[in-house]
Amino acid sequence: MIESTPAPAAPKPDFSKSMFLLGNWTCSTKSSRRPAAFITTSTTTIDPTGYWMITKGVQHKTSWTRTDFKGVDMTTYDADARRWVDISTGDEGSYNLSTSPGWRGNSIVWTDAVISPQGNVMSTTPTTLTKMSDTKMSSHSTFKEHSGRMVTVDSACHKTG
C-alpha cells in the first residue's frame, strides 16, 4: 500500500538561549601563534524558515593575511540526535562541522566533528563560548599543530547593534 499521509515537519529549534547572539558583533581574537589580535565583524540572523541561526562574518585583513576572510556559520538543532549542530564554510574552501549538547548555564561547548585540513591544524579541543551579558561574550579553544605545539585562541566580543 502506498502511503498518502504527508511526513510531519521536523520541530523547529528552540533558539531562546541563543537569541542574544542576533545582531552585529565585533570580536578581537588573539592566537598564541600570531603577533597581535585580529578583528572579526559579524551579523547573526534567523533564516526565514526558522530552522537555522546564520552568522555571516568577516575576519579583517592583518599583516599575516592577504585579504579579508569571509565565512558563514549555520546552526540548528537535531532533535533525533538531541544535539546542536554548527556547519561553517569559508573562503578558500574551509569547512567545519561541530556539535554541542547545548547551553549549560552561561556557556556552550562545541566539539569539532570534522575540520578542514588547513592552516597546519592537526587536531582541536572543544571551543567554549561564554555569555558575559546580552552584549558581551568570550570564547576559548586550543588546537595542535603538526609539530605538536599547542596553540590557544581567545576571543572577546561585543555587540555593536
Protein language model features and the residues they cover:
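Hydrophobic small-molecule pocket/channel-lining residues, especially in calycin-type beta-barrels
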Residues: 1-161
